[in-house]
Amino acid sequence: MNEKRMPLSAIETPAVIVNMDVLESNIAEMSRLAREAGVRLRPHTKIHECPDIAKLQIAGGACGIEVGAIERALCMAEAGIDDILIAHPFYGDHKLAILRRLLDKPGLKITVMADMIEQAEEISRVGQALGRAIPMLLKVNTGGDRFGVRPGEPAVRMAKRLCRLPGIAFQGIYVHESGGNPTPEGMDRLALEAATMAVQTARLLSKEGVPGAHVSVGASPTLRATCALLKGKRFPEITEIHPGHCTIGDMWHVRALANAREACAAAVLCTVMSAADPRHVVIDAGYKTFGADSLIQYQDMPGFFWQGKPSFGSVQGREDLWPGRISAETACVQYMEPDPAPAKRLRIGDRLEIVPNNATLTISMQEKIYGVRRGGVERIFTVAGRKDRTPAV
């Protein structure tokens, strides 16, 4: 242990901390599952937006990383990460300028995504101007109903059009499943349906003579179900998976079965500002720290409400506390027992660690994350992917 490291008590609150033991365990589990399934792991980094955590994932066995918006790729490339997949299709001059900037970096492999010919044609023009073929995947919608063309014949028709574009190197297809019932059986079913549609589409492409060896599927809630399918060699066409949130975990993904509660690595460290009311205490973090995601989509699950209120997180080590009233810069954490014993009462100045509902939102509002181990700060991570920190083109 480094005796000179910052003690946890020296961190100014509110702040986001990440338990290094839990983070490393999550990274190791993701890599192990992918390795046993015989596929590449390309974690989505939207949960942390941090190049140093991405490097830990690559050191743990990931083949590269994935980002959502193209802007998020800049900080990762600047940090020396050399294999980046941009998961969201993009369009417009500003986005293309960022693409050019990325393509100018020696040794950097950038793979882009499309689900419309209009996006691909713009990227094609960039590739032609640079005298190179830009790797591209076709995003296929297997039921998430966000980006993507439908699987089967619609995907085959679009893939053929992409293959005819100069300046494009068509690589294959990409699926990101979502939805499903938050039960083990529901996740098994969702994983099977997504893998089946992806592989059926890949087989159609091969039958039609369309080159495209890349077939990726995956999401955090279906990580274990997908890897179990692939470990059984049922879908040998699938080459890559791309879960993201289970690196860090949050209460959303506890409910979605992506993480156990103890596998949530991040928490908001906050301080009790007032204990004047016997029914609750007031902390120095509100929705400007936690975000405002109440996870209302899970309102029918048992324990979602207490006294008519949803929670904005879960207090570490205190199941008797309910963080259920939140405003801009403060929040109330309520005692669930009507008259708690003196030993259970919080005092002004006490600190709480609260696992947020949506860690992506929480981390995106921070400039740094404190990596802690055994009561001290082991390292400080920069949240370089924050939108307001993205370098200008």
Which functions belong to the PLM regions below?
Residues 1-18:
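Generic N-terminal amphipathic, Lys/Arg-enriched alpha-helix
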Residues 2-3, 22-53, 66:
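N-terminal glycine-rich anion-binding loops that anchor highly charged ligand groups
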Residues 23, 46, 76, 138, ...:
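Conserved, mostly hydrophobic/aromatic
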Residues 44-182:
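Active-site-proximal beta-alpha core segment in soluble small-molecule metabolic enzymes
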Residues 135, 142-258:
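Active-site loop/helix belt of alpha/beta enzymes
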Residues 223-308:
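Active-site loop ensemble at the mouth of alpha/beta enzyme cores that anchors a bound cofactor
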Residues 279, 283-393:
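C-terminal accessory subdomain/extension
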